[in-house]
Amino acid sequence: MAVVLSERAERVEIGREQQIQPQPRSTGRRASLSSGIGRAARSIGQVFLFAVFGLYGALMSTLVVPVYSVFVRDRVRRAHGIRRLMYHITRTYIGAMRVLRLIDLEVSGIDRVPSPGSLIVANHPSLIDALLLLGHVKDGVVVAKRSLQVNPFTWGGIRGANYVVNADPQSLIDECRARIAAGETLVLFPECTRTADDGVVRLRRGAAHIAVRSRCTLLPVTIEFSEPLLTKNSRWWLAPKVRPSVRVRGHAAIDPGQFLKDDCSVSLAARRLTEHLREFYSDKLKVMEPPRRGPT
């Protein structure tokens, strides 16, 4: 009798343990479902903001810039006004990305440009890099690709703000030197295109030539994403599986004059500065670990 009662007690205890044990498959499915829902929601938000950006660009080209030009005839004053407007719009746009939980953003060191007439250079991993910088650099002048000047959604803002257009290498250097001499702060991506999927930053020498010939202060900025977002070959409508953390950091300013030592030529100094920047980005752009958080 005692043996029978003991066996029954053991069965009851085993049954309780089986009920208490977690169900890993079910939990994994719920986590996967939650992650999928989060990605779908962020993809919808991403498409929505693309539509908003397109509408804003169309309004800038067809309404804002033409009307503003009627009331502000002076070209310099008009450009400053449009650039201030761009500053507030890009801040609002990036703020909307944060509110919609498309990105987590950490910014440091780029809101205090060393002096007027400086050159800000940054790596270019994503389509939103220019927005990230323009939203933190008041009156910044972007060096834009020529294709954006004829794009119906961007030409109004580029022409109204009098941004520099990268058409011809020599004329670009001359134009940038003139802008820097006039006290404008330029924002330039030395890669001239978004970073390739292998993550290697391949710099061209244009930025170095501008800095060396202008003898202007150069502020290097690093832009890092924990997850690929709007990269060179990604689908614009599909958000990453995990919400990206974005880190934008301004580093110690560089004096281009130090690369002109030993009476070297401007071309040699530009090569030295380009190599210095290449090593700088190779060292600073380590793999960014995403923060620990729950499903998104």
Tell where the protein language model's regions lie, with residue ranges.
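A generic structural signal for well-ordered alpha-helical segments
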Residues: M97-R98, I158, R179, A211
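Membrane-anchoring hydrophobic helices of lipid-metabolizing enzymes
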Residues: V3, R8-S118
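Residue-level detector of flexible, active-site-proximal loop/helix-junction positions
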Residues: D111-R112, Q149, F225, I254
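Catalytic core of membrane glycerolipid acyltransferases/transacylases, capturing the structured
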Residues: V65-H88, L100, P114-D168
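Non-catalytic C-terminal accessory region of glycerolipid acyltransferases
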Residues: A2-R30, Q170-T296
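Thr-Gly-centered strand-to-loop micro-motif
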Residues: S108, V143-K145, A167, P190, ...
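Short gly/ser/thr-rich secondary-structure transition/capping motifs
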Residues: V99-V107, A167-Q170, L230-N233
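Short amphipathic alpha-helical segments and helix-helix/interface helices
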Residues: I94, L133, T154-W155, C176, ...
